[in-house]
């Protein structure tokens, strides 16, 4: 056998030269302890804050506490299969989710994995869940209406595109119903409106019952609204880290539309449960507790999330992301820690009350305590014209109604005020799943403000409204179309509208 030393040395040299180029370096650590959805890991020295790490069996986690001798990792999933001594791998990636139009019509979890059984989502883009909000320069003040389809809100507490409007109230006061009706109200625009007016909807369910989320999805599906919506669900049985992450994941999905010159709406239902999940994680990570045992940065948790809802200026595509965060109060206590935090972050609040709800005033909006800090710049001119006086009249009515309980002999002017107020309150009631177009709301409120309801018994107001709407949809279609296109009520339109309501009033008996 002939051994060629030169040849062998050439092969060895070549192997030595290329040695280590394909070697994949993956930094690993070891689990020191695990429990309550938190793992303490030793050895991930270069891990980044918020980085995704991988446990055996494909379970993912997120590094939150970077300490001198170990890393505190929250686990996205069950910690039952993780034991002391398991190896943990860095992924090198900060937590991200799929984004884009491919997610429309789907139900996903907080990491963007589909949970609706409709197959995989082939999204072309991914985005980090926790991005910095747009600065001051790329923004523009809110000036386009975001129509909810609810008279009480669109007339009195208008919400604009790019605004953050808090929906706050006790349990069972119809908070989710407001978000649901707002999503359903976008269907008409999606069916036959221009692309620039379409509003894509993201609904984030945090810590809710699975049956509730399933019911929500079913309603959207039956009414054809799921096609322009994304549902992100972290239900009550999901681990706390998923409930903490879900709003950020939903926000990243909404931001895709905002940054591409489109309009999106996101509802967080509800942020109280996210704060509770965050408190649980923080206490288990042994971070110092503050007021009500919430960690010191719980304000920052919500402010950095809600600041991402914005209206961008024309140079940045003129897109918008509107946020409707929900907060659940306990016994109407708006001065608790989380409610006051979120009230101070948002641009106004819609305050719902149990008493109003049980009196049959639904949506149960307390018009006195609710406010929109964007105000009438988020309304079309026609709505400003008719709804301008209604808030004042209702405020006077509430004040007088309190006095009227004591005295029986009221002068005619006070009596008129009370009559008008009772009828306007009745007019603002609206059944669920029946949002109205803006021009229809304008016509109905016009009738109320101009005294057409004053002679009717209060219990006939709803019937009058339904009759008037069906009459206008058939006979007065031209007037409604004019209001929609001109977005204002000229003297000519006003005369036509009065004529239409007059002719209907004669036939209504």
UniProtKB/Swiss-Prot annotation:
CDD domains per record: ATP-synt_F1_alpha_C (cd18113), ATP-synt_F1_alpha_N (cd18116), F1-ATPase_alpha_CD (cd01132)
Binding site for ATP: 169-176
EC number: 7.1.2.2
Record site feature (Required for activity), residues: 370
Keywords of this entry: ATP synthesis, ATP-binding, Cell inner membrane, Cell membrane, CF(1), Hydrogen ion transport, Ion transport, Membrane, Nucleotide-binding, Translocase, Transport
Localization terms from the record: Cell inner membrane
Broadest EC class assigned to this enzyme: translocase
Superkingdom, natural source: Bacteria
Catalytic activity: ATP + H2O + 4 H(+)(in) = ADP + phosphate + 5 H(+)(out)
Pfam families per UniProt: ATP-synt_ab, ATP-synt_ab_C, ATP-synt_ab_N
InterPro entries referenced in this protein's UniProt entry, alphabetically: ATP_synth_asu-like_sf, ATP_synth_asu_C, ATP_synth_asu_C_sf, ATP_synth_F1_a_nt-bd_dom, ATP_synth_F1_asu, ATPase_a/bsu_AS, ATPase_F1/V1/A1_a/bsu_N, ATPase_F1/V1/A1_a/bsu_N_sf
A single Gene Ontology CC term: plasma membrane
Membrane topology, as annotated: Peripheral membrane protein
Gene Ontology terms for molecular function: ADP binding; ATP binding; proton-transporting ATP synthase activity, rotational mechanism
Record-linked PANTHER family: ATP SYNTHASE SUBUNIT ALPHA, MITOCHONDRIAL (PTHR48082:SF2)
Function field: Produces ATP from ADP in the presence of a proton gradient across the membrane. The alpha chain is a regulatory subunit.
Family: Belongs to the ATPase alpha/beta chains family.
Protein's UniProt name: ATP synthase subunit alpha
Origin species: Sinorhizobium fredii (strain NBRC 101917 / NGR234)
